């Protein structure tokens, strides 16, 4: 998939709110090393740096456009284009932040234990994933994709996000690998100025798997 930092940042305040809440819950007073995986344009990395200004932080993302924006935003932090699923840090870390990225990576039954294993003893994995596949907007994406001239092109688009599990599944998965597991669910409400604004919001994230395979004329028809 291709990602646009400019599109993503049209709703920067709204997109950053969940990561502010997440980073505030990290139960560590002092952090020496941290990684922001799936850092996007650096807004989440900035929140992490504000919490731990003395830490050595790196940011990783699969999108060159996102990394370019992150480097411009935070030139003193090292950002790299990387495949999160294949990433191997040089040494164990105090904190791994994964904000709104793991839903795009399959195999959570092995991915999460592998991420925890990259931490120092007493380290923290702070992960946030959207739970919105049953929302009207996401159901409509799948319906429109399967009912139009683009159906063949988009037959796999809805599966771009990995299988969603319930909170207790993640608790049972993480518990053997961590002495403390804290899981919660929050609903964020974002008042937007009508249907077009909702489309603009979704073009930054959820619509990417549906728009990328289409020609420009098809994209306009799909969004209409």
Language-model regions: role of each:
Residues 3-4, 177, 181-224:
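C-terminal helical/coil "lid" or tail adjacent to the Rossmann-like core of SAM-dependent
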Residues 33-37, 41-87:
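Class I SAM-dependent methyltransferase SAM/SAH-binding core
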Residues 88-96:
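A short acidic, Gly/Pro-enriched loop at the edge of an enzyme's catalytic core
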Residues 105-106, 119-121:
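Helix-to-beta-strand junctions that scaffold the AdoMet/dcAdoMet cofactor pocket
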């Amino acid at each position: 998939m291709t990602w646009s930092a400019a599109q993503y940042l049209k709703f920067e305040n709204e997109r950053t709110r969940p990561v502010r809440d997440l980073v505030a819950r990290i139960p560590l007073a002092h952090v020496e090393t941290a990684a922001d995986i799936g850092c996007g344009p650096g807004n989440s990395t900035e929140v992490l740096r504000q919490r731990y200004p003395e830490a050595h932080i790196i940011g990783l993302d699969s999108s060159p456009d996102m990394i370019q924006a992150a480097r411009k935003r935070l030139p003193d932090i090292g950002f790299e284009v990387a495949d999160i699923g294949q990433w191997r840090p040089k040494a164990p870390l105090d904190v791994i932040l994964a904000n709104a990225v793991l839903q795009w990576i399959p195999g959570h039954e092995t991915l999460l234990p592998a991420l925890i294993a990259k931490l120092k003893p007493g380290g923290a994995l702070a992960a946030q994933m959207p739970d919105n596949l049953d929302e009207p907007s996401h159901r409509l994406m799948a319906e429109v994709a399967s009912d139009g001239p683009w159906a063949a092109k988009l037959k796999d688009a809805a599966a771009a996000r990995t299988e969603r599990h319930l909170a207790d599944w993640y608790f049972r998965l993480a518990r053997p690998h961590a002495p403390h597991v804290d899981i919660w669910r929050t609903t964020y409400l974002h008042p937007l100025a009508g249907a077009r604004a909702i489309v603009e919001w979704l073009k930054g994230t959820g619509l990417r798997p549906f728009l990328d395979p289409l020609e420009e004329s098809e994209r306009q028809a799909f969004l209409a």
